[in-house]
Every structure is written in structure tokens, then in C-alpha cells.
């Protein structure tokens, strides 16, 4: 017939003639449970809508017949978005904030060898002899914090055109402009993905308050020619931060959450993806590539 009740309730009807589902009643809503496994690509002419936990943030996603999936962007007029993108110059382009690049900059030539090498990115490398150089990109306007009215969603895509064990990494929120001039795990009020000089490239998720460190291995390791997509999320007033990291080349994902030793509430931090050659003195011992940094807040 032209219309019928679904689930025995007239508030949800299916109009077979017009192929329309109607949610009636008062204060209607549709709740979609987040997937554990990515759905298959739909057939030609169709689009799959679903939800997924991305770094602790439940996100609406769509997938087309090509198999490519992407999240739906929140309204730009609500909350705040802070974005860095590569432009072919060391500064790149920050939106809604200001920032700075550091290290010997070169524009990349994309090649199709892997998802990382095909990615448009800026690159920064160390010069010869000088130790503990800061390489990469960060915003310089301390804007982000945990606690009441704080919280943030952070995402970044980066990797290494050259990685040598003994280097450092901090894809993170931090208060110190020299967060990788020493081991990032020693810097107060820092949260994110780090490598200390003695870690031999092992990437950890780290939180540190004013004094105490909490450091958890992701199981993924920095390798020359490999890229990573990282995310972390803590809601306003939240006491737990969730995280995820994707090995872009292998497709391997690690995730977790922690409530231990978060940065001191109300301490303003900056966002960045930074690396250092630490004690490595040969030129280009470390060459960091960064494609994008994205931070979203509710205020």
C-alpha cells in the first residue's frame, strides 16, 4: 500500500510509493551505533552513512562506491577550528591562529610509492653538527587546555622522509616552545604522541601534568618513508583523553585512553608536530614531513 507502520508504531512510517521514511511524533531523533569494522563500499549510485569513534570523538562518516570514506565536517560557525596546511613555504598557512616552522625546509615531490610519499606535505630537516634542533610546525598562540570550558579534538597527518633512531618526536599539545630540544616526556603539561631519544623510534602516547609522566606504547615505530594519522579527544570538563594512531602505509591502527596525569586544568597549550635530531649530528638525520594539523574546540 502507499504507507505502513514500521516496528508497530505509526510515528515511524514507510511511504512505499515515494520511497520515504518519516519519523513523526515529538522530538524525534535517529541514533546510529558506531561501527567496529569499516563497512564495505556500496554499489554504484549509493552512499553509506555510518558513525565511528575517531580518536575518542564519535563522528558521522560516509563511504562511496570507490571505498574512500571521510567524516562529515562540523558547522564552521559553531565552535572553533584551527587548521595548518602546507603551501610550499616553511610557514605554511594557519587558519584562526598563527604559527611558525623550524628546520631546513624543502618542498616535497610527491611520488606514488606509498600513501605517505603520495601525500602533499612540507618537510624540515636538521643541519650538520648542531644537536637538539627543532624541526616542524606549531602554532604560537596558546589556546587549548583541559578542564571546564576547555577540551579539544586534535588530528595530524605526518611522517618521516628520513628517520634515524636517536631522534625525537612530539605530535602533541605542549607549553614549551622547545618541547623536543630535550625528551618530550620530561616537559610539564604535555599530551600527545612522542618519541624520546632512547626509544629507538617507538611511538608512545604520553600525558604529563606538572610533575608526573604517564607513557603508553602504541606499538608503532617511526620508519623512513612511513606516514601516520593521529587523533586525540577530550571533551569540555572531561577527565579522560582518548587517542588513536594509524600507520598509513600498513593500515594498522592502535588506540586507547587515559585519565592519568593530564595537563594541569586551565594551563593553555599550543599544538604542533615537531621532531628533533637530538644528539645525531649528520645532516638530515631526521627529515619530518607534515601534511596537516587540525584542532577543533567547542568554544
Residue ranges and their predicted role:
Residues 156-158, 171-173, 293:
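Short hydrophobic/aromatic patches on beta-strands that form ligand-binding or substrate-lining surfaces
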Residues 164-175, 241:
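Beta-strand acidic-aromatic groove motif in beta-rich domains, primarily in extracellular
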Residues 1-80, 87-90, 100-102, 130, ...:
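Extracellular repetitive beta-rich solenoid segments
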Residues 254, 285-299:
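Extracellular polysaccharide-targeting segments
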Residues 154-156, 225-236, 241-245:
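Short tryptophan-centered beta-strand motifs in secreted/extracellular beta-sheet-rich domains
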Residues 73-163, 237-238, 297-299:
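Low-complexity, Ser/Thr/Pro/Gly-rich disordered linker/stalk regions
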Residues 257-289:
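Flexible glycan-contacting loops in extracellular carbohydrate-active proteins
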Amino acid at each position: 500500500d502507499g504507507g505502513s507502520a514500521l516496528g508497530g508504531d505509526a510515528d515511524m512510517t514507510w511511504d512505499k510509493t515515494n520511497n520515504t521514511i518519516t519519523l513523526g511524533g515529538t522530538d524525534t531523533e535517529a541514533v546510529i551505533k558506531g561501527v567496529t569494522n569499516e563497512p564495505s563500499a556500496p554499489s554504484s549510485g549509493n552512499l553509506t552513512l555510518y558513525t565511528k569513534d575517531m580518536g575518542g570523538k564519535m563522528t558521522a562518516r560516509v563511504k562511496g562506491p570507490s571505498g574512500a570514506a571521510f567524516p562529515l565536517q562540523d558547522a564552521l560557525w559553531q565552535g572553533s577550528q584551527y587548521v595548518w596546511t602546507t603551501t610550499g613555504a616553511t610557514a605554511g598557512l594557519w587558519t584562526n591562529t598563527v604559527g611558525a616552522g623550524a628546520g631546513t625546509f624543502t618542498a616535497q615531490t610527491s611520488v606514488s610509492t606509498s600513501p605517505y610519499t603520495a601525500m602533499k606535505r612540507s618537510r624540515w630537516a636538521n643541519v650538520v653538527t648542531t644537536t637538539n634542533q627543532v624541526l616542524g610546525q606549531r602554532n604560537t598562540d596558546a589556546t587549548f587546555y583541559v578542564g571546564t570550558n576547555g577540551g579539544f579534538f586534535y588530528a595530524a597527518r605526518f611522517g618521516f622522509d628520513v628517520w634515524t633512531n636517536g631522534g625525537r618526536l612530539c605530535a602533541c599539545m605542549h607549553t614549551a616552545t622547545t618541547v623536543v630540544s630535550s625528551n618530550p616526556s620530561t616537559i610539564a603539561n604535555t599530551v600527545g604522541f612522542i618519541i624520546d631519544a632512547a626509544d629507538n623510534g617507538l611511538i608512545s602516547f604520553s600525558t604529563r601534568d606538572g610533575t608526573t609522566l604517564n607513557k603508553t606504547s602504541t606499538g608503532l615505530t617511526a620508519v623512513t618513508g612511513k606516514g601516520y594519522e593521529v587523533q586525540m579527544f577530550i571533551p569540555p570538563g572531561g577527565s579522560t583523553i582518548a587517542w588513536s594512531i594509524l600507520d598509513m602505509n600498513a593500515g594498522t591502527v592502535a588506540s586507547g585512553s587515559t585519565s592519568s596525569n593530564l595537563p594541569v586544568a586551565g594551563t593553555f597549550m599550543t599544538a604542533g608536530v615537531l621532531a628533533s635530531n637530538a644528539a645525531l649530528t649528520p645532516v638530515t638525520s631526521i627529515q619530518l614531513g607534515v601534511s596537516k594539523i587540525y584542532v577543533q574546540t567547542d568554544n
